[in-house]
């Protein structure tokens, strides 16, 4: 399993420090969670390409994630059938990525926590649902709040590229 070296950990720690949530997993755990998230249900995914709720999932899809749009007001997003609710996502998912206002996010966290595959629950930057997150954590689920998946993914991608560059330089490539 790939682990973070001090350089990678520092880059990710800078992004993690932007979150107001003090109970998020540490950098090593975040790294493992992001690496295992391939099938991602995006609750609140937007049809509007200018919104973060569309840009972030688009980026993840471009990086190889299977993004499943969840939006009751859309038929298709990014060429995929949108599901009206998280309950309508019948296939297993590794992560539920939430783009809903904080006052509505708790219900989504509770729904995600009830899924049999026990997905990672990730509330995007600016979104918190402390009580629901605590309930999910009590069930042993990984919950991340108030943290931008794009920024984390980019930090990990950037550090991977730097590691590759350092390796190439060491080999004399």
Predicted segments, located by residue:
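Helix-enriched interaction subdomains in cytosolic or periplasmic regions
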Residues: 1-17
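Alpha-helix C-terminal capping/helix-to-coil transition sites in glycosyltransferase folds
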Residues: 36, 91-92
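NAD(P)-binding Rossmann-fold cofactor-contacting core
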Residues: 46, 50, 57-78
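Structural motif
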Residues: 94-95, 120
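ADP-ribose/adenylate-binding Rossmann-like module
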Residues: 112-136
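Glycine-rich, highly charged phosphate/nucleotide-binding loops
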Residues: 20-26, 76-91, 97-107
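A charged, well-structured terminal subsegment
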Residues: 152-173
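Conserved beta-strand elements of the Class I
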Residues: 41-43
């Amino acid at each position: 399993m790939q682990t973070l070296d001090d350089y990678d950990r520092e880059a990710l720690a800078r992004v993690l420090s932007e979150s107001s949530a003090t109970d998020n997993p540490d950098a090593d755990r975040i790294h493992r969670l992001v690496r295992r998230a391939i099938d991602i249900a995006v609750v609140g995914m937007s049809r509007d390409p200018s919104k973060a709720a569309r840009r972030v999932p688009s980026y993840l899809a471009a990086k190889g994630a299977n993004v499943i749009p969840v939006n009751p007001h859309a038929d298709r997003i990014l060429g995929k059938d949108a599901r009206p609710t998280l309950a309508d996502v019948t296939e297993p998912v590794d992560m539920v990525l939430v783009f809903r206002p904080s006052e509505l996010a708790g219900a989504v966290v509770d729904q995600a926590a009830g899924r049999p595959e026990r997905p990672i629950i990730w509330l995007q930057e600016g979104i918190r649902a402390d009580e629901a997150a605590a309930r999910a954590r009590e069930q042993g689920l990984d919950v991340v709040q108030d943290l931008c998946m794009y920024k984390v993914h980019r930090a990990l991608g950037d550090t991977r590229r730097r590691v590759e560059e350092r390796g190439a330089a060491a080999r004399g490539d």
